[in-house]
Amino acid sequence: MSNITITEAAQTHFANLLGQQPDGTNIRVFVVNPGTQNAECGVSYCPPEAVEATDTEIPYQSFSAYVDELSLPFLEDAEIDYVTDKMGSQLTLKAPNAKMRKVADDAPLLERVEYAIQTQVNPQLAGHGGHVKLMEITDAGVAIVAFGGGCNGCSMVDVTLKEGIEKELLQQFSGELTAVRDATEHDRGDHSYY
């Protein structure tokens, strides 16, 4: 069974929407381009004739959510919520594993660090149009990274590296990583955030 959470507020929202659809209509949760940097998650109506034998059904009180076989591992730990604030209401879908499959706790260090970068570090950098890529981990436990996008040439990259990325990764991989170093040849330009 997949670990997808649909909050009570989102369930109520879906139930209201589905009440206006033909009987037997449910929802489908999916990932387009799963496992890539271009991964995008979505929710759509799922009429009975669109259910495939390989789909996983996740039953809720007044509807079911169907997930296709390919999307399922990339929706691990996903959460769908319906948030209301003074600006209005909106459906939110958070899927930390959409761009990269969750790795096992006993996976090689390189895979675990890459996973942490893709799911924890890059979403924070994306707000500035930037990203970081793990190039290698040395025998001395130094993670070598390269910045791209808005981070390349940014005057704040040293602070981002030391106070953000390195601090987070050293805490998470205590005893395994000793440092994080930047291998980027920074080229300041219009693409740079600061």
UniProtKB/Swiss-Prot annotation:
Entry's cofactor comment: Binds 1 [4Fe-4S] cluster per subunit. The cluster is presumably bound at the interface of two monomers.
Protein name (Swiss-Prot/TrEMBL): Fe/S biogenesis protein NfuA
General function of this protein: Involved in iron-sulfur cluster biogenesis. Binds a 4Fe-4S cluster, can transfer this cluster to apoproteins, and thereby intervenes in the maturation of Fe/S proteins. Could also act as a scaffold/chaperone for damaged Fe/S proteins.
Entry GO MF terms: 4 iron, 4 sulfur cluster binding; iron ion binding
Keywords: 4Fe-4S, Iron, Iron-sulfur, Metal-binding
Cofactor(s) needed: [4Fe-4S] cluster
Subunit relationships: Homodimer.
InterPro entries xref list: Fe/S_biogenesis_protein_NfuA (IPR017726), FeS_biogenesis (IPR000361), FSCA_dom_sf (IPR034904), HesB-like_dom_sf (IPR035903), NIF_FeS_clus_asmbl_NifU_C (IPR001075)
Record flagged with keyword 4Fe-4S: yes
Protein family according to the UniProt entry: Belongs to the NfuA family.
Organism of origin: Vibrio vulnificus (strain YJ016)
Residues noted as binding [4Fe-4S] cluster in the record, renumbered to the chain: C151, C154
Highest taxon listed in the record's lineage: Bacteria
Single Gene Ontology BP annotation: iron-sulfur cluster assembly
